[in-house]
Amino acid sequence: MPALLAHPDWETPAPFVIWLHGRTVNKELDPGRYLRWVRAGIGAVAIDLPGHGERLDPAYHSPAKTLDMLTQVVGEIDEVLDALAAPEYGEVFDQERPAIGGMSAGGMATLRRLCDPHPFVCAAVEGTTGDLGALYAGSPERPWPVTHDPARVAAVDPARHLDGFRPIPLLALHATGDQMVPIAGMQGFLEALRERYRHQGADPAMIELRTFTDTGAPQEHAGFGRYGNDAKNAQVEFLVRHLRPAPPAAG
């Protein structure tokens, strides 16, 4: 599977993040994100979503193929973990400290994967939702342009699989005026998830939501515009706090 790999030194075991980009872009988008992680002592493992980047199939750039894309990539995440444990990498990707994250469609896949047994220590998503039923039902803020089979939506909808969601630290970043993925759906999902944490005896404060208003980003959806630096700093701080990387050696 095509992947962009980055590591603080390629010698010392380091925690890492599997990152899933959004629809219509590719794994090379936003290299500054990966550079920040590496400088903080965290490895980056960014993969192309099905039909994107080096796996190009233009049909997968259409909203009509989103469910196919999500279904496929959720099933591929364990393949990525297995590949990183191969001898050729010399154990530099610490299998005891993996994290996962994604933006928009990549965040949806991230949240669905977390509803099944997994090894991840923490997760970070942005501009996404865990309530696909609400997203595809449309809303005054964002009527969805494609009608999907409700049964297929339910299969990949994190909100329909919360019973399997093991409490871990979760950071969600969102623009309050997001026109593609309205924040209301994510707020409702996170509240349901907090209740799930409570029932499991976990602290609901493990779930963090950071919002940004009037970012200036296209459709208030991608990159957080004038707050992009703040968003990236918040994400790095969260990852460092929970993955406990060793800072790269000076020089």
Residue ranges: model-predicted function:
Residues Y89-S104:
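Alpha/beta-hydrolase fold nucleophile elbow
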Residues A64-G90:
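Alpha/beta-hydrolase active-site loop
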Residues T24-R36, L49:
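The serine-hydrolase catalytic nucleophile loop
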Residues P50-T71, Y136:
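Cap/lid segment of the alpha/beta-hydrolase catalytic domain
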Residues A109-A151:
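Hydrolase active-site cap/lid region
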Residues G133-R198:
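The feature captures the conserved acid-bearing segment of alpha/beta-hydrolase catalytic domains
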Residues R198-G251:
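C-terminal catalytic histidine-bearing segment of alpha/beta-hydrolase fold enzymes
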Residues P13-G22:
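Short beta-strand element of the alpha/beta-hydrolase
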